């Protein structure tokens, strides 16, 4: 049995990784290990309990501290994470460590795996996301990784240009598409309890100056007024999100606004199925919403450089009128073409590749420059 340690560090990556986790668990030649870390341990959501309610968690790695925010705090958290992951890998002894994306939890785990001589597999490498500081970490993880599970053809080609051997690069689609067809709309009673929202706002911190983060949040909330009822989902733990959260709290008592905390993936998808538009700066606007046929209005620089379908409209400056106009255009629009992120089945493809009898990868990296 080949031991595969899957790293989850947040509510977002857990939802994306779930299909891969399930496929690994069902594979007869793979032994699943789950390591939960980082933002899962932070209040107020403390999403580690959500993970534990669904899966056996084999190790927990503390990284961030809830009372400290910012890039310096993140750097300290990475150091804490490298140490914690190294200890977990020593105890669990996985043959392969699997990470997704660009967050500091993935970067810390990738660093510990690479230095510790373990095979590293990376999902969603090669993507561009110039609007966040984590862009550099995504590409750093790519250079540490031995196996690459790219979400799009363009991302796969970018990984090859990094000098990674072609035999290690697999275009498998995005796991964000997996299972969408099986997730129904939110049930009517829950939808009614939340005011039957037709507009969803999901805005995360983008690592911008505090005044700019708050300005974006204020104009975003002002922009969705009049397109309600509105569901506003509280942000993740990215730098700057505390200023977004302050603006959301200030608007929480308004009668046409329903503020929601952590939503698991099926509930979030069920909410989107009722929505006319998703507004914000989450990658869900580019991937899940597009796959569901829900147009999106992307705000600010956070998703800059990422591949996107025609159903995503851009607002590059914090301007209420431009946001309002983009929402109206999105709701009225008929958008041609699909999206570049595949048609599902990504988790099964990843598990199949991990379970191949000859995993022809050496922990000693070889570039193809």
Regions found by a protein language model. Name each.
Residues 7, 15-16, 25, 63-166:
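Active-site and donor-binding regions of nucleotide-sugar-utilizing enzymes
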Residues 30-74:
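Conserved nucleotide-sugar phosphate-binding/catalytic loop shared by glycosyltransferases and other
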Residues 40-45, 141-215:
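A nucleotide-sugar donor-handling region in carbohydrate enzymes
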Residues 99-100, 107, 122, 148, ...:
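A donor-sugar binding/catalytic signature common to diverse glycosyltransferases
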Residues 192-245:
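Conserved catalytic-core segment of nucleotide-activated headgroup transferases in glycan assembly
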Residues 255-264:
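Active-site donor-binding acidic/aromatic loop of nucleotide-activated sugar
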Residues 329-369:
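C-terminal amphipathic helix plus adjacent low-complexity
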């Amino acid at each position: 049995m080949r031991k595969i340690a899957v790293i989850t560090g947040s509510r977002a990556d857990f939802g994306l990784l779930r299909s891969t986790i399930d496929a690994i668990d069902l594979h007869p030649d793979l032994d699943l290990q789950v390591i939960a870390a980082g933002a899962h341990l932070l209040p107020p959501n403390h999403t580690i309990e959500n993970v534990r309610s669904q899966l056996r968690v084999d190790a927990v790695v503390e990284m961030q501290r809830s009372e400290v925010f910012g890039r310096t705090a993140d750097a300290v958290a990475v150091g804490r994470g490298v140490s914690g992951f190294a200890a977990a890998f020593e105890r669990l002894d996985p043959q392969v460590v699997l990470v997704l994306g660009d967050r500091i939890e993935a970067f810390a785990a990738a660093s510990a795996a690479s230095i510790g001589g373990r095979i590293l597999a990376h999902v969603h490498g090669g993507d561009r996301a110039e609007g966040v500081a984590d862009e550099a970490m995504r590409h750093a993880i790519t250079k540490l990784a031995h196996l690459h599970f790219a979400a799009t053809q363009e991302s796969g080609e970018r990984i090859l240009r990094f000098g990674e051997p072609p035999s290690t690069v697999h275009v498998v689609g995005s796991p964000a598409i997996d299972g969408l067809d099986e997730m129904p709309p939110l049930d009517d009673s829950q939808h009614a309890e939340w005011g039957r929202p037709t507009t969803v706002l999901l805005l995360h911190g983008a690592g911008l100056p505090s005044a700019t983060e708050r300005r974006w949040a204020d104009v975003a909330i002002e922009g969705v007024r009049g397109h309600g009822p509105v569901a506003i989902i509280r942000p993740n733990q990215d730098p700057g999100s505390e200023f977004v959260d302050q603006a959301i709290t200030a608007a929480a008592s308004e009668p046409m606004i329903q503020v929601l905390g952590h939503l698991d993936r099926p509930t979030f998808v069920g909410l989107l199925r009722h929505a006319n538009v998703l507004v914000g700066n989450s990658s869900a606007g580019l991937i899940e919403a597009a796959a569901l046929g829900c147009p999106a209005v992307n705000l600010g620089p956070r998703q800059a450089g990422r591949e996107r379908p025609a159903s995503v409209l851009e607002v590059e400056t914090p301007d209420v009128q431009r946001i309002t106009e983009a929402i109206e255009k999105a709701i009225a629009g008929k958008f041609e073409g699909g999206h570049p992120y595949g048609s599902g089945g990504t988790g099964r493809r990843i598990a199949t590749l991990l379970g191949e009898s000859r995993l022809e990868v050496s922990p000693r990296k070889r570039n193809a420059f």
